[in-house]
Amino acid sequence: MAFEAYRLLIANPQLYEPDFVSQAGELSEHWARENWKRREESLRHDKVCMLLMNTEPRERSHTQAEGEEEGSSSRSLATEEGEKRFSLEALEGLVDQGREVLLENLEMEEAQANSDSEGPNEADSGGEGEEFVFGVESESEMEVASEVTKLLEPDLIDSNFRYTLLEGVTSGKFAQMEFTALWGINTNNKWDLVDRVNRKLIEVKVTTRPPTGVWEEVVAHAEGTDPEHNGAYIIHDDLCGNFTPYKFGNISDLPGWPSAQDFPIRRHAFLASYGGVPSAGGIEEGLPAWDDVFMERTRNWVAPLWKKGPISVRRDDCPRMEPFNITKFITLLEDPRLRNTDKSAKWKGKILPVSWCRTIISSQEKDIDMVQEVIRDLGVIGLWEEINANPVKVERTVSALSELMRLFQEGFREKNPYISVKRKCKGWVITGHKQTPALTDTLLELGVGYKPYQMSNVVEEDMRQCETDDIEKMKWVDWMSKLAATESEPLGSKVSRDDIFKEAESRHVLDEPAKKMCSKVYDLYRSHKIGATCSKFMGFYSRMGGSYLRAIAGNSRQHSSLAIMPLYYKTYQEDGTSTRHLTGLVIRGPHHVRESTDTINLLIVEKTCLSRREAQERLSGGALVNGVWWVRKNAIRKADPTYLAFLHNSLFVPTNFLGELVTTPKHFLRQRQPRILGRNPVWQLWLL
């Protein structure tokens, strides 16, 4: 809201006409990179310059009729015949007179060149370093008819006006070049107004600083410009609605000041009504980039650093840091089991571990067939109760699940596991179904149509991020230890294929015993429930990432639709047969993720073996449906499948450690054998 008042000023047609804003503002090169405050201040300057000029006509020119009134303010008021009413003989005479002046000047230049070649002569040259320029010095040496000057003068922006506007005009730069070339004025600056009677280049300023100081800066900035041909019209703003003009450089009063004074007064009133506060420091302040006193002190402070001198080592008597003691560090750690709080940690994983799930044995191979088996086992959604969640939100989630099950079952008849979602003028709808409040609420549960507004660059009051508190400490509970124990239970079969841990061929002499040790670790992983949990995670994230990649490659365009997929892990028997163990299903919302942190919304349904009390103790934010089905919403990031689809690679750390035991036995056994192998006698058997 800091610049909103200035945006309203620009949009106010009582201050700035739309055409003026377009020509002087939007079409300018600086408009796109400035904020609203600087844009409005630039328009204010152009508007003041425009009001100060074009109010006083010049003296009658040779193109005006003799009977035309002297007070005519514009050449456009005269008729076309009146503008052309002049004598052709008089014009030819003026041209001949100009040609004679030019020939005389050329003769003078040749004579001066001859005198310079013969030798400097102070009497002939007219003074050392004196140069002749046509149109400037010639006026002092011979009289040139004023009609010639008027004839050569450029006809720019109503030539019958005394003042010509340069600021904010597309051709202003070229107009200034024409005037300065005609009058013989050298300048490197861009000016705001031109007084065509007194041949003055005028700078206009609206400032809150003392006018005298501003004029000194204008003079310094205009170094190289003839002081007789420049001046400044400085308007002082006291920030209270009063504006006082000051003239510098012997310029005439600008007759447009009454109109120009009314404009900033009205602008000040509108700014106050919009809640803006007039402040100093605008674009015309032109504050110096540095202060001489400050820079001098800075140079004096830095100067000793460059002087060479004796180097003396500073004595440091500070106490030294003690070596890190892991035993002492552990004693400083807080025991989470002893925290005095009623809140305990809950399971935050996207899907449940295998030891908490009930499985449905299936021989199906296609996802759509496995999903139908899960839906048949789920049956009709009946009783449910919220678990550590808001009952109102949970009710919406369960209702959305029931509606989605009905919609997906309609698609299963055509072997279609997707629900197409499109956006229309009235909102998001499901293809083939009328828009109803129930379907709208169902889509909202998967994030469809949830974003209430589109991102824009407009500053709003509620854009400030909410304050965040420290992470709340929770109490350690026994279910974490129990989970580690249950995940270590044997599975009765093996997950994953034998070639999942296939290693590169090597001929090192110690590779064979190292491979035997790693193979035992792999077998332990594949034959226990932790391996089944990892297999379940890998299958889920592989589908999420693979679906996204196929959509990017163009082979599948279903990433913008609702999709349903099963949750399961696969076991292998000794005879080579395989079995799929279904634990639930996932409904994936439509997504167009681009950044790595963009999310994909999910509705997850899993069959659990936890009792109501255990679910209340361990799970967070969901509903227990029909007593055994755990239902909740969640989301994953775009980058998650990149790593979690290859979760088995986490075994690299322990297997690499075992490889170090084999490849460096002397160092390891000498240093750590009593401490590690003494507590793990089974490892000694492996080393044998």
Swiss-Prot record:
Acidic residues: compositionally biased ranges: 119-129
Localization, UniProt: Virion; Host nucleus
Keyword DNA damage in record: no
Coiled-coil segments: none
UniProt region (Disordered), positions on chain: 54-82, 110-129
Keywords: Host nucleus, Virion
Biased composition (Basic and acidic residues): 56-65
Highest taxon of source: Viruses
Gene Ontology CC annotations of this record: host cell nucleus; virion component
Keyword Plastid recorded: no
Subunit-level organization: RNA polymerase is composed of three subunits: PA, PB1 and PB2.
Function: subunit of the RNA-dependent RNA polymerase which is responsible for replication and transcription of virus RNA segments. The transcription of viral mRNAs occurs by a unique mechanism called cap-snatching. 5' methylated caps of cellular mRNAs are cleaved after 10-13 nucleotides by PA. In turn, these short capped RNAs are used as primers by PB1 for transcription of viral mRNAs. During virus replication, PB1 initiates RNA synthesis and copy vRNA into complementary RNA (cRNA) which in turn serves as a template for the production of more vRNAs.
Name of the protein this chain belongs to: Polymerase acidic protein
Gene: PA
